[in-house]
């Protein structure tokens, strides 16, 4: 887009690429895939096998608890979190683009890790309709919210 070699970009993040493009002076707009029948795919999803889930349930439950505490910390200490980020990544803390991206991104972390089997069923139905997969399976065979709460 910046070199005028394309008119559209897909799978961009509104809180990253849109901000960067606007800072570059590009005339950009955003549309959500879900408004056009493509399932949303921007959730934080943790994946494991049924065996590991059974064998390590206690550890994984503690892991989710730590993630939630981290999200609390992010939301309650935004400036400190930005400082940690800039220090760790060795980025310029005065960079207005990165500051705006972080300001837009930090509130995106939420506590609700749950997803419905219906969501995954709609996703796989869309994948089948668009020829990406040949058959669908019962989402309950690969999705659980057992430790999401």
Predicted regions and their residues:
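Pocket-lining segment of extracytoplasmic ligand-binding domains
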Residues: 2-88
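Conserved C-terminal helix/tail region of periplasmic/extracytoplasmic solute-binding proteins
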Residues: 121-149
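Generic structural "secondary-structure junction" signal
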Residues: 48, 54-55, 111, 135, ...
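Short loop/turn and capping residues at structural boundaries
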Residues: 12, 32, 97, 138-139
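Short secondary-structure boundary/hinge segments and terminal tails
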Residues: 19, 38-40, 103-106, 144-147
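Secondary-structure end/capping motifs
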Residues: 54-132
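Residue-level detector of short coil/turn "hinge" positions at structural boundaries
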Residues: 8, 28, 93, 134-135
